[in-house]
Structure formats: structure tokens, C-alpha cells
Regions:
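Basic nucleic-acid-binding alpha-helical/helix-turn surface characteristic of O6-alkylguanine DNA
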Residues: 1-123, 170, 174-181
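Regulatory, non-catalytic segments
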Residues: 124-136
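Major-groove DNA-recognition helix of helix-turn-helix-type DNA-binding domains
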Residues: 141
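Short cysteine clusters
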Residues: 144
Length: 181
């Protein structure tokens, strides 16, 4: 979904991992995108950083924004297993079901595209599940990196398979990066 409507507030934040784009509708986060730019393996990858556009958010939205940054940094440092910030998911009924089911995959666990299709009641819709996850508007928060191919291989990932491997290793879903070739 495109968040170019005036009802959305977009704020850019940079940490040691790179550039992040947060999009809010009121006090709910509806978009989080990672543009990269830094080596995610860096020991300083989770350093807190001031947002580049602090003045764009005020009041309760500012509180949620700061909570989102804090939770994101804690997660990227391996110290947070589940996000608690309020979110809003946009999409068709099918897409919403897929994204909500993906949020229920526990930290350190994986599901296959096929298993997710079965969970949402469309057992033959593996490809549609993959397309929905490819367009995940809340990267990291909706943990589509926890969805792997039926052969238990890495599968695709919008942010790149190297990052997917790193996240799954950090979560302990695989013992090492070579387990997902």
C-alpha cells in the first residue's frame, strides 16, 4: 500500500543498520520499511539514534514513535521477542489474514508458505501467501522472515536472503546461517 495520503505521517529514522521509514495513521503504525545502508552484522547495529524528522510527530503519536524505535532497537539487539506497539494492517481480507497469521509465528520458530496457506484456510494459495509477504507493509514487526520454503530452505525475502538468514540465526530458528541454503 502507498502511504502518500495526508492522513499518514511519515518519519525517517537512521540507526546503525541503516535508514528506516515509519508511517503512522494517528497513533497506529501502519508502515515500517528498511532501506538498508549499514552492515547489519556491525557490533554497533543497535545503537540508538535521533530521528531525522523529530518535529513531524507530536503528542501520543510521538510516544508511539519513540516506543517503536525502542522496540525495534531492542529486537535488533536480540532483546525483544514480540512487539507491542499498536499497528494497523491494510489489505484485502486474504492479505490481512496472512499478515495476522504471520504475526502469530513465535520468535525462534518458522512456518512454511504452505503451512501459512493452510492456517488461513487456503491450502493451495502458497504463491499468494508469498506475494502478500513480499508486500508486507510492516517489515520486521510482521515477521515474514520466519516464513520459509516447503523444503525448509530460506525462501525469498524482500530485504534480501542474507538479512533473512541473520534474523533467523539471531532468533535461534536455525543454528547457523548454513542451515538455510
Amino acid at each position: 500500500m502507498r502511504f502518500d495520503n495526508p492522513r499518514f505521517t511519515t518519519v525517517y529514522h537512521r540507526n546503525a543498520w541503516g535508514q528506516w521509514t515509519f508511517t503512522f495513521e494517528g497513533v497506529k503504525l501502519c508502515g515500517l520499511e528498511f532501506q538498508g545502508g549499514a552492515n547489519p552484522g556491525s557490533p554497533k547495529a543497535c545503537a540508538y539514534a535521533e530521528p531525522e524528522a523529530e518535529g513531524k510527530v507530536r503528542g501520543r503519536t510521538a510516544q508511539i514513535y519513540h516506543s517503536a524505535i525502542r522496540e525495534l532497537n531492542l529486537y535488533l539487539n536480540g532483546k525483544l521477542k514480540k512487539f507491542s506497539i499498536p499497528i494497523k494492517i491494510y489489505g484485502t481480507e486474504f492479505q490481512t489474514k496472512v499478515l495476522e497469521a504471520t504475526m502469530k509465528i513465535p520468535y525462534g520458530k518458522t512456518k512454511t508458505y504452505k503451512e501459512l496457506a493452510e492456517i488461513v484456510g487456503h491450502p493451495r494459495a502458497e504463491r499468494s501467501v508469498g506475494n502478500t509477504l513480499h508486500n508486507n507493509p510492516l517489515q520486521i514487526i510482521i515477521p515474514c522472515h520466519r516464513v520459509v520454503s516447503s523444503s525448509k530452505g530460506i525462501g525469498g525475502y524482500t530485504l534480501g536472503t542474507d538479512l533473512k538468514r541473520k534474523l533467523l540465526c539471531m532468533e535461534g530458528a536455525v543454528e547457523n546461517e548454513l542451515d538455510l541454503e
